[in-house]
Amino acid sequence: MNIAEYILSVLKSQIFVLLSWGFHRPVRLENGLRFQVQGFIHRGTVEVVYVEGADLFEVRTLNADGSIKQKEEDVYLDCLVNVIDGMVERTPNYKERVEQEYKLSR
């Protein structure tokens, strides 16, 4: 299994969170994975890169021109989904945003 497949398997371990990002178009990178999202916080490209010497990950959201919008370094494997979720989807008023977006009533 290459690193892109490994990262994807970690993300899929929390499939409902992954789907909430509007995850699509995964692309293998030399040392990671790039994909598109349509979250409440970020719509566009996310890159997850394995930092081999540290055995950690770097997560980046990118602007449309490819420049780095936000970067989180030294991300442990077991925190990967949570860190990406905080950069892409989860807002302080997440429950209300979901209800509003999908016109759900209590």
Where are these regions (language model features)?
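Short, surface-exposed beta-strand/strand-loop-strand elements in extracellular ectodomains
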Residues: 53-66
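General beta-strand recognition
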Residues: 34, 47, 56-58
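Short, surface-exposed coil-to-beta transition loops
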Residues: 42-46
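A generic beta-sheet turn/junction motif
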Residues: 39-41, 52-54
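Negatively charged, low-complexity tracts enriched in Asp/Glu with abundant Ser/Thr
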Residues: 1-40
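Mixed-charge, Lys/Arg-enriched low-complexity segments
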Residues: 65-106
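Generic beta-strand structural signal
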Residues: 28, 50-52
